Amino acid sequence: MKLSIKIQLSIMMFLQFFIWGAWFVTMGTFLSQNLTATGAETAMAYSTQSWGAIIAPFIIGLIADRFFNAERILGVLHLAGGGLMLMMFGAESFDDFYPYVLGYMILYMPTLALVNSVSFYQMKDAAKEFSLIRVFGTVGWIIAGTLISYYFSWDSSSSVADGMLKNTFLMAAYASFALGAFSFFLPKTPPSSSADDKVSMRQILGLDALKLFNDKNYLIFFISSILLCIPLAFYYQNANPFLTEIGLSNPTGKMAWGQVSEVIFMLLLPYFLIRLGLKKTLLIGMLAWVLRYLLFAYGNADEKTAMLIVGILLHGICYDFFFVTGQIYTDAKAGPKIKSAAQGLITLATYGIGMLIGFWSAGKIYDAYTIEGVNQWKDIWLAPAGFAFLILVLFLLVFKNEKIEVNE
């Protein structure tokens, strides 16, 4: 792959995840503090990610893979998304805000597959080349959080009170317009199939991969993945409002350290998989979720700040050791014929169904433990900690270890 193309793809990935990180992390704080949203309403807003994940396969399967170049659809979706971001910036109530965020996520979630398609089409050896491109996406997310906290200080207590967090949507809008325009100059990525080819709902939803459920061990893992997305949703939805409310300085910037941790443990993951094996690696990932929420439950922004920081830094183990390991396991079990269908199915099940249940649960728990306007954060965090521990115990008892091939 030419250096010029590598640079183009790296910029694309950077902007793709800069956009997401620019507003998604702080949305819960903005909604609760500036639009006086309830936990249930905040859950509705975050659930748009899940609805987008559920709808995305239809957009990709029925349109992107058949009629238009991927880079052109990417451009159109981001230009339209930038317009919706401007509407979110101007919204003055949750009722005004919600239709725009729903529309935006329906447009944004398909772009995650599109940037991968554009990248893979240019690569001769995706196994070696893709990670070097994808890491710029994580860098984009980190830079977005760093700018919000350390440069603009939009998430400081005074700035939040003044409504400055709405500027995150403006920043995301500008980045969306930039990526939308830039996309039309990306290398051409034609449709992967002809417009005349018949596409079934079974193919779109990855249902060909259902045969994997004949393997009891994989079925246990699949169900566990959906269930673990419930505590995962608590982090996305409640972590920033929690850290902001208790007075942790630069909360969004510090949360970006979790992505730094993610990159480090991503590089270390093959080592641990080889030394520990599949089951122990997955169990460590589950245990990390329990520990993270216990640290949040008993930490504070004073003498126990270190507990909060460790909870944030556990993100690499939480995500990589379970969810990335799960992708590797799925890839190994599926084989070449249904590999894409299997990855599509588990993505739909986790980011669609699992997270949808998770966001709803997080909203319910948040409202249940908000008494006379005061959030009982200890109780809010103990709920996902207990649930993650229950999943951990059940998984320990019923999942059998398997050997999978891992390239160091």
Where are these regions (language model features)?
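Hydrophobic core of transmembrane alpha-helices in multi-pass small-molecule transporters
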Residues: 14, 84, 94-114, 118, ...
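Multi-pass alpha-helical transporter architecture, strongest
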Residues: 2, 88-89, 175-188, 352, ...
